[in-house]
Amino acid sequence: MTEPIISFKDFSFQYHSQATPTLQNINVDIYPGEKVLVVGASGSGKSTFANCINGLIPFKTKGNITGELYINNQDATVSCLHDRSNVVGTVLQDTDGQFIGLTAAEDMAFLLENNCVEQDDMKKNVSYWAEKVGMIEHLNHRPQDLSGGQKQRVSLGGILIHRTPILILDEPLANLDPATGHETLRLLNNIHEETKSTMIIVEHRLEESLDDTFDRVLLFKDGKIIANTTPSDLLKSSKLKEAGIREPLYCTALKYAEVDVESIDNLANLRDVCMSEHVKFKVKKWIDETSANNDNKYKSEPLLELNEVCVQYSDYSNSVLNNVQLNVYRREMLSIVGHNGAGKSTLAKAICGFLDITGNIQFCNRGFNQLSISERSEFVGYVMQNPNHMISEKMIYDEVALGLRARGMKESDIKIRVENVLKICGLYAFRNWPIAALSYGQKKRVTIASVLVLNPEIIILDEPTAGQDFYHYNEIMSFLIELNRQGKTIIMITHDMHLLSEYSSRTVVLSKGQVVADTTPVLILNDKKICEIASLRQTSLFEMAEYIGISEPQKLVQLFINHDRKVRRQ
C-alpha cells in the first residue's frame, strides 16, 4: 500500500500568543499525487495547517506542538526550513510577504540564481513560466507597479520553477479576477497532471474552486477537521453551513426550486446536474411561479464627478487611467470590476489623492484636486486591498481607534464607537489581541473597521470580502447596506461576481484604464463580450440557465437574489 507523503497523527498546535490551540487533534493522511482542497471560515486553522506542512511552523513561527507530523516519511519537527523548501513549495496568501526581487523577472529567478543556473537557461525558465502565468509582458515591472493579482502570479511562477513534489497554494484566487482565477485553476490542473505532484489548495472561493477537480475536500472549523470527503458528498451534507462557508450558488438555487440534491450523483459537476429532465422541470417551474422584479435604482444626484482623469506612474509608462469620465451618485452602491491591472485600485487612489492626476475631480460641485489627502479623508474613506499596507498599531483596539484619536475625540466617545464597529465586524472578542496573531482575513476586517469608525460620506472598499467566510461576508455586507440606507455612498472594487449582482445597483467596468461599460450588474454579466474584455466570469447561475435552456438568464439571477434576501432576513 502507498505510504502517505503527509501524515498528521493526533497533531495540535498552539501559538504562544493564544490561550487555546489553533489546530486541535488533527488526524489526516495525504497521499502522493493527490489534489486536496482545504476550506474553512476565516481563522479556522487552514493557513496554520498549511504552514505546519511547509515548515513556517515551527521554524519561523513558534508555538507548542503535540502529536506527530511526517513529511515524505521524515519527522517534520526535526528537519530545517531550507530542507523543507526542497520538498514543499508554497504560494503565500500575502504576496508582499513573498516578493523579494526588484522586478518580476528577478523575483521569479531568485531560486535559479541561488542554484547558480546558467543565465541563458535562467532566462528561458523565467520566460516559460512567466508565459504560463500570464506575466510575460510585466517581467521588467517593479513590485510597486503591479496589482495584487499580478504579484500573486509572479509568486506562483517563482514556485513552479522549483517543481517540488508538494505544492501548497494559500488562497490562490483571492486577488485574481474571475477569468484569470479560472485560468489559474486550469493551469494548476495541467501542472498536477504533468508532474503528478501532491497539490494542496487552501481557498475561500468554493464555487470557483470546484470548477477544478479534487480528490478530496478537508473542511476546517475551530481548528478541527469536520469533513474529509469528496466534493459531491460535501455539497450534499450540511457541513458547509455549519462551518460558515457559502455553498455554490447553483446548489442553493436547486434547493430553492425544491430539487432533492441528495439524490444527485455528481452534484459537484453543474453540467451533469443540469442534464436531468427533473432538474430542468423544477427550476423552470420555480421561475414561472415566482416574480423576479428588481427594484434597485440608483440616484440621479451626482456626488463625485471625474472628468478626463488620467494617471501615469512615470514619464516612460503608458497611462494607467486614460480619460476616465465617471459620476458617482449620492446614496448608491456602486461596484467597479475589471481584469487585474485594469486600473481599479489606481482609480480609488486617484480619488483619495494618493496619486498625481491630470483632469478634474469634483465633490458636491467643489474642486477636489486642491484638497490634501487629509482633507479628502473627511469625505472619502478607503479600505485598501492589502491590509498590511494600512495597519500601523500593534493591538486591534488601538488600530481601529487611531483615526479618531488623531482627530482629537474624547477617549470615552472613542470607546463607544470603536466597540460598536468591532462588534459589527466580528472582532469584538479579539479587541485586546495583537494584530500579529490574526489571520489575513481577520486583518482585513480590522482595516475595514478602522475606516468605518471614521464615518466618511463615501466609503471605497477594495475587495471588501476577500478572505472572509460566508458569516463575516454577510455581516460586512449587511453593515454596508445599513450605511447605504443611512445615506452613505458605497464604492466596492470586487472580483466577486455575485457580490456585485446582489448588492450593487450599478456596475462600472474598467479595461486597460478606460471605462468600457456602465450599467446594471445583471446586464454586465449577461454581456459575454464585456465579460471577455474585462476578464469577468459569469456565476454558476448564468451557467445553470444556459445548460437548462433558459433564454433570459438574468431572470433566474434576479429571482435568486430576491429569494435569497428574503430567506436570509427570516
Swiss-Prot record:
UniProt keyword list: ATP-binding, Cell membrane, Membrane, Nucleotide-binding, Repeat, Translocase, Transport
Places the protein is found: Cell membrane
Xref: PROSITE patterns: ABC_TRANSPORTER_1, ABC_TRANSPORTER_2
Catalytic class of the enzyme: translocase
Pfam families in UniProt: ABC_tran (PF00005), DUF3744 (PF12558)
Presence of keyword Zinc: no
GO CC annotation: ATP-binding cassette (ABC) transporter complex
Domain spans labelled ABC transporter: 6-247, 304-537
Membrane topology reported for the UniProt record: Peripheral membrane protein
GO molecular function: ATP binding; ATP hydrolysis activity; ATPase-coupled transmembrane transporter activity
Known EC number: 7.-.-.-
NCBIfam families on file: PRK13648.1 (NF010167)
Job description of the protein: Probably part of an ABC transporter complex. Responsible for energy coupling to the transport system.
The protein's name: Putative ABC transporter ATP-binding protein SA2476
Native source species: Staphylococcus aureus (strain N315)
